[in-house]
């Protein structure tokens, strides 16, 4: 068996609310809201932050490299597919996901009623138990663009195990 090394990565994403009607997706779950987020994909900030955390932990390029914003094939794709791609890239290199932890920052809508559903969707995409998926929701205390309800942001941290020989110079 190969020696494995624990690695961590951090991800962040922010999207403004769309000017045109579209669904609000967070953590792969449709959240009832009068406003969705603007973006090339489904604009799921939580999935994007988690994918970037995973890619960063593995020392791989960020999601913009794998899913360029101007690429028509990426238009409106489900962001759980972006998470699945990050997981696939890690597994192709002999790695595995240990856990993720994240925070959503939004004044509205109220997110807490959907946290368990998000953990289930993300756990399935990550190939881990939902108990290893942390999601917290907080506000920006009415400060800045997020406080003015102009958008939603997310931070995420991911822990992965990778073969040690892949991490050596």
From Swiss-Prot:
The answer to whether UniProt assigns keyword Hydrolase to this entry is no
EC number of the protein: 4.6.1.12
Q: Which gene encodes it?
A: ispF
Q: What Gene3D superfamilies does UniProt report for this protein, alphabetically? A: 2-C-methyl-D-erythritol 2,4-cyclodiphosphate synthase (3.30.1330.50)
Any idea what job this protein has? Involved in the biosynthesis of isopentenyl diphosphate (IPP) and dimethylallyl diphosphate (DMAPP), two major building blocks of isoprenoid compounds. Catalyzes the conversion of 4-diphosphocytidyl-2-C-methyl-D-erythritol 2-phosphate (CDP-ME2P) to 2-C-methyl-D-erythritol 2,4-cyclodiphosphate (ME-CPP) with a corresponding release of cytidine 5-monophosphate (CMP).
PANTHER family recorded: 2-C-METHYL-D-ERYTHRITOL 2,4-CYCLODIPHOSPHATE SYNTHASE, CHLOROPLASTIC (PTHR43181:SF1)
Reactions performed catalytically: 4-CDP-2-C-methyl-D-erythritol 2-phosphate = 2-C-methyl-D-erythritol 2,4-cyclic diphosphate + CMP
Recorded hits in CDD domains, A to Z, give: MECDP_synthase
* Binding positions (4-CDP-2-C-methyl-D-erythritol 2-phosphate): 13-15, 40-41, 62-64, 138-141, 148
Report if keyword GTP-binding is assigned. no
A Gene Ontology BP annotation from the UniProt entry: isopentenyl diphosphate biosynthetic process, methylerythritol 4-phosphate pathway
- Name any cofactors this protein relies on: a divalent metal cation
Q: Which GO terms describe its molecular function?
A: 2-C-methyl-D-erythritol 2,4-cyclodiphosphate synthase activity; metal ion binding
Mind listing the UniProt keywords for this protein, alphabetically?
Answer: Isoprene biosynthesis, Lyase, Metal-binding
InterPro entries assigned to the protein according to its UniProt record, in alphabetical order: MECDP_synthase (IPR003526), MECDP_synthase_CS (IPR020555), MECDP_synthase_sf (IPR036571)
What is this protein called in UniProt? 2-C-methyl-D-erythritol 2,4-cyclodiphosphate synthase
Species of origin:
Akkermansia muciniphila (strain ATCC BAA-835 / DSM 22959 / JCM 33894 / BCRC 81048 / CCUG 64013 / CIP 107961 / Muc)
Under the heading SUPFAM superfamilies, the entry gives: IpsF-like
Binding positions for a divalent metal cation?
Answer: 13, 15, 48
The record's comment on protein family reads: Belongs to the IspF family.
Transition state stabilizer (site feature) positions:
40, 139
Q: In which pathway does it act?
A: Isoprenoid biosynthesis; isopentenyl diphosphate biosynthesis via DXP pathway; isopentenyl diphosphate from 1-deoxy-D-xylulose 5-phosphate: step 4/6
Q: How does it assemble?
A: Homotrimer.
UniProt lineage: Bacteria, Pseudomonadati, Verrucomicrobiota, Verrucomicrobiia, Verrucomicrobiales
Cofactor remark from the record: Binds 1 divalent metal cation per subunit.
């Amino acid at each position: 068996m190969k020696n494995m090394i624990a690695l961590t990565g951090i991800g962040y994403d922010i999207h403004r609310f769309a000017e045109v009607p579209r669904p609000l997706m967070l953590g792969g779950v449709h959240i009832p809201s009068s406003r969705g987020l603007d973006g090339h994909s489904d604009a799921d900030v939580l999935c994007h932050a988690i994918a970037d955390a995973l890619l960063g932990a593995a020392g791989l390029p960020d999601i913009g490299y794998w899913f360029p914003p101007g690429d028509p094939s990426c238009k409106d794709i489900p962001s759980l597919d972006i998470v699945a791609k990050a997981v696939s890239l890690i597994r192709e290199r002999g790695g595995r996901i240990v856990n993720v932890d994240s925070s959503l920052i939004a004044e509205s809508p109220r997110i807490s009623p959907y946290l368990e559903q998000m953990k289930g969707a993300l756990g399935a995409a990550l190939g881990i138990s939902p108990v290893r998926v942390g999601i917290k929701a907080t506000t920006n205390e009415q400060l800045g663009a997020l406080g003015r309800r102009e958008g939603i942001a997310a931070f995420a941290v991911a822990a992965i195990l990778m073969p040690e020989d892949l991490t050596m110079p």
